[in-house]
Amino acid sequence: MEIDILSLFPDYFASPLQATILGRAIKQGALSVRSRDIREFGLGKWKQVDDSPYNGEGMLLMAEPVVQAIRSIRRKKSKVIYLSPQGQLLSAKKSRELASCSHLVLLCGHYEGIDERALTAEVDEEISIGDYVLTNGCAAALVLVDALARFIPGVLGNQESAEYDSLENGLLEGPQYTRPRVFEGESVPEVLLCGDHQKIADWRKQVSLERTRERRPDLYLQYFYGNSACLSTQEDLPRIEVVSPKTFSVVLEVQDLRKAKKFYSRMFGKECWDGDKLFLLGKTSLYLQQTKETRGPTTVFIELETDHDFVRFLKRWEILGGELGEQGTGGFPLRQVFDLDGHIWVVSCVQK
């Protein structure tokens, strides 16, 4: 695999790409990484690559030098990636996907960013390594190279180790132990010494689930949702309890009352209805009002009792034709969903 990195600081990558596993992989020919200076394509005598933006402060990389730099190395099957906090969050799945590419061009941002016209013209995808801003995109490029390199045959000494690392199967990796058997009075779990590979595998899976639920509930719920049995009929959908300590009523404007009522009947149960009024729980009520043109989406916040209810709610919503939106960040089980009329439901569950 070949990777070209475009930045204003090509020397930034010298040490990381010469040492550790990446350096060994490059020496052995499993991976080729080249760092190129965007200033080589700068304009005029002074090789200008940046200018002040029209609509803000600071400096911005100009479109022409960036476009020329990309086109000088781009091939027919190249994939150009811009490292940006606005991009898709990097994951193990995305890293594995990128590792199958024959040639990647990684574009590092600098200053306040890059002229949008360069991104529109040449960039195939934007990737972020997290919800924070760095002084430049060089560190992000290194993170991406390191993450995807693990999935390139010949880079790791033991390729199987990549399959058991944290997040590879959507869960955090469980605890690891080596010699001595007892350290400061604490012993290695007996199951790891029994020699029964199936018992060990079951133990690893269980502690992995427990650790993920404790430390990353967002990942746990995502894993649980993706691996839960598919629900196909109304009878398969158990009742979901909604937490509502306060009194409130919500009016939703719908274009087809019969269709909307059917959707919510299957979501929350027919026994909850009184005419066009839906009782979610206790004093909480939802009114459906038919209108030819709605005044825009209404946002409803709903909190569920357990993480199992949270997963079932999302599964049921999707099966009945609702749309799943963005997943919350920061480890909190939160999801935005849309009903048949475009109204927004922000769904969460109680934190215990």
From Swiss-Prot:
Say yes or no: keyword Mitochondrion present. Answer: no
**Which positions bind S-adenosyl-L-methionine?**
109, 129-134
Query: Is the keyword Cytoplasm in the record?
Result: yes
InterPro entries recorded: Alpha/beta_knot_MTases, Glyas_Bleomycin-R_OHBP_Dase, tRNA_m1G_MeTrfase_C_sf, tRNA_m1G_MeTrfase_TrmD, tRNA_m1G_MTases_N, tRNA_MeTrfase_TRMD/TRM10
Report which superkingdom the organism of origin falls in: Bacteria
Root EC class: transferase
User: Main localization of the protein?
Assistant: cytoplasm
Subcellular location as annotated: Cytoplasm
What EC numbers are recorded for this enzyme? 2.1.1.228
Keywords of the record, alphabetical order, are:
Cytoplasm, Methyltransferase, S-adenosyl-L-methionine, Transferase, tRNA processing
Provide one Gene Ontology cellular component.
Answer: cytosol
| Enzymatic reactions | guanosine(37) in tRNA + S-adenosyl-L-methionine = N(1)-methylguanosine(37) in tRNA + S-adenosyl-L-homocysteine + H(+)
Q: Which family does it belong to?
A: Belongs to the RNA methyltransferase TrmD family.
Subunit structure comment from the entry: Homodimer.
NCBIfam families per the record? Answer: PRK00026.1 (NF000648), trmD (TIGR00088)
Q: Which HAMAP family match?
A: TrmD (MF_00605)
| Function, in words | Specifically methylates guanosine-37 in various tRNAs.
Q: What is this protein called?
A: tRNA (guanine-N(1)-)-methyltransferase
Which organism is this protein's natural source? Chlamydia trachomatis serovar D (strain ATCC VR-885 / DSM 19411 / UW-3/Cx)
Q: Which gene encodes it?
A: trmD
